[in-house]
From Swiss-Prot:
InterPro entries: TF_fung (IPR050815), Transcription_factor_dom_fun (IPR007219), Zn2-C6_fun-type_DNA-bd_sf (IPR036864), Zn2Cys6_DnaBD (IPR001138)
Gene disruption: observed consequences: Results in the significant down-regulation of cluster B, whereas it exerts no influence on cluster A.
DNA-binding region extent: 17-44
GO BP, one annotated term: positive regulation of metabolic process
Natural source organism: Aspergillus terreus (strain NIH 2624 / FGSC A1156)
Cellular compartments annotated: Nucleus
Application notes: Azasperpyranones display potential anti-cancer activities. Azasperpyranones A, C, D, and F exhibit potent growth-inhibitory activity against the A549, HepG2, HCT-116, and HL-60 cell lines, with IC(50) values of 2.39-14.42 mm, respectively. Moreover, azasperpyranone D significantly inhibits HCT-116 xenograft tumor growth in BALB/c-nu mice. In addition, azasperpyranones A and C can bind with four kinds of therapeutic targets for cancer, eEF2K, FGFR, survivin, and TNF-a.
Protein name per its UniProtKB record: Transcription factor ATEG_07666
Pfam assignment, any one: Fungal_trans
Annotated GO MF terms: DNA binding; DNA-binding transcription factor activity, RNA polymerase II-specific; zinc ion binding
Coiled coil: none
Any Gene Ontology CC annotation: nucleus
Amino acid sequence: MSCPAARKGRQQPGFACEECRRRKARCDRVRPKCGFCTENGMQCVIVEKRQQRGPIKGQLNSMQSQLELPAGIPPVLDDFDIQASGLSEHDMSLVAATSVGTSTEASLILPAALDKLELPASSEAAAAGLPGWPEWLDWQDMNNSSLILPELTASTLTDPLSLDSLNGSPPTMVDSSSKIQMTDLIRAELDQLYFDRVHAFCPIIHRRRYFASLAQDNHTTAQLCLQSAMRALAAAMSANSSHLSEQFYSEARSLLDTHSQTPATPRDKIPLEHIQAWLLLSHYELLRIGVHQAMLTAGRAFRLVQMARLCEIDAPGGDLQLSPVASSSSSISTNTDSSESFVDAEEGRRTFWKKWHVFLHADTMQNSLTRLLPIQVSTRLPAPEANFQNNQPTRTSFLADAMAQTGPSTLSPFAECIIMATLHGRCMTHRRLYATEFEAGTRDFCIRQGWLATAVERRVQMLVPSPAVDSDPMLLFTHMLAYRATVHLSITVQQASWRTVDQQVLAAAYQQRAAQAASEIVRLAKAVPYLSPFKTHPFLPDTLACAATFLSTQTATDGGGDDIQHLLRVLGELQDTHSLARDYLQTLKLQVQGNRQDGWY
């Protein structure tokens, strides 16, 4: 029995021409010109690729009714991927319980269920009266982790104050760092990280007292400012927590700005934590943002230090009125011998000297004359770290007495750094003063030049090399700063117009000292990689760049090019954590490249 013949398809293969489609006539689909167009002498236009047909009749109305009904939300939530959304099961239960009742919540479509709804294109939706995608929503950049819906968090659903900010505000496309949910464990880790890395070059916080304040139930605004500033700086000095630094910085900055705008009465006293927070934020900005913003922020701290009169903590007959700075736990009192009062006064001293230290380096980088050096300072130098942290009162020298000291030094690394920074600042002032106002080479110039050279040389000899230099960022920076002062004195001498043979011999001697000092900076720079970039002093790149600039401007010497390349490598290792290193590295590379073209090395 033979099989029946296959039925011929009713529709011929291919597409009908546009003229037959318009006339609703049967097209024979002959190519290149169908029979109807041939008989009527018309142009036969055939479109091979056509857009897909629109929704079937009633589909748009059905979808629109589903969007308007609250009952359409629960099925979407059932299919939503909780793991990919980043929301906990508790948060999702809150969403399901509170998302029924308003049209705004009912129209919230989660990304994981959008493919199932098959929404029409924007033009078709507009024709149907449906709202299209907002302009701020880029579908190609949207994923379950980067799209943050503020309505779908437990904190916003339970906090009535946060609900007001949701009206009319679109979801925010942000990175994960600005929306990290801080836990007590994260804060504890950053607090510990601060004392492990930051405190070494910014020793102004008493460790035991700080952790005791954290255990309190109520914190003042100044304490919250200090906590956020410390954690921001600690996160900036960590690879694992670096993404948290911007969030803590913004929080601290907002708290400080709000606190600064609060009207104060004459009886109010400046919280010491407020000044410390501004100083720490200036260090953060120096590491992350840039020197100009850091100096603007440091200026806020400078003015607060002057208002609090921290330079008069140890003035003769000093009392509470002479130091109107208030700590959160107790007020500074210079007349009692209790250990707590010593810690109060010592924190005030360290805050003042840190401000002094930052000011001197800011003055150096901004190339301006130092005006605060001649002022009378009635605050003693910082006590040794062990005495400070263990509440053991001790009496230290004033700055002027310590600079005149000739015997072995018994001061703390922080105090030694302050003395050397002061000498370095005076060398810079001496250089600029005689370059702008007086003639270099005069008698006054020679006297001051000789005094500074002797003072720096004596201080270098007092800084006996020790194994701690390679592991202490403050000591390492102090040694480099001493050699940098020698380099600046040599540069100052080169600007003088020497007339006698003795003066020219003296200038050559200064040049030789500067070359040796630059070599010592290169030697000390070899310890920076072992110290770790996360513990390196924020102002260290400035000293490295000074040595590299001096070496690059000298004539070719044995190993001079290798020393410069080593300094550039160290700056390259610091550029990820120190903005100064990034800025100087680009400038020095161009300078070195130009010197190579000149055939120096």
